[in-house]
């Protein structure tokens, strides 16, 4: 039986996701698989490629032939170089950036909400500012009157 390592398409119309599978070469693209070796998501940035290297090495060792798209993926992950004994077995796969947890995102949004604008009316702040200015003016007037009273008492003596 001729065995191929190929892609099985999943996903919606414009959002394809693929499984990397081992299947009989005569089965259709989305037919029955012998084994699932990994996934490939081309729409993510950078593309997500997760392939079980040990199982790929096994299937290549027993004679499974990769299709052209799968061969390109195996070269990116370094599995093809490892199988052939070529240099560059580490591959050129880019690491996925770490996603922030939902709890961290929630806490950041909560902190922004606490520091952001409040639901209080703006006019109350204006009134409070006027009131503070009036109180400061009243304190200054009292201080001036006290200074004048002291000056009068000293001059009367």
Swiss-Prot record:
Pfam families: Ribosomal_S16 (PF00886). Keywords: Ribonucleoprotein, Ribosomal protein. Residues 125-157 are annotated as: Disordered. Residues 125-141 have a biased composition (Basic and acidic residues). It comes from the Bacteria. Residues 142-157 have a biased composition (Acidic residues). GO terms for biological process: translation. One of its GO terms (molecular function) is structural constituent of ribosome. InterPro entries: Ribosomal_bS16, Ribosomal_bS16_dom_sf. GO terms for cellular component: cytoplasm; small ribosomal subunit. Belongs to the bacterial ribosomal protein bS16 family. This is Small ribosomal subunit protein bS16. It comes from Corynebacterium kroppenstedtii (strain DSM 44385 / JCM 11950 / CIP 105744 / CCUG 35717).
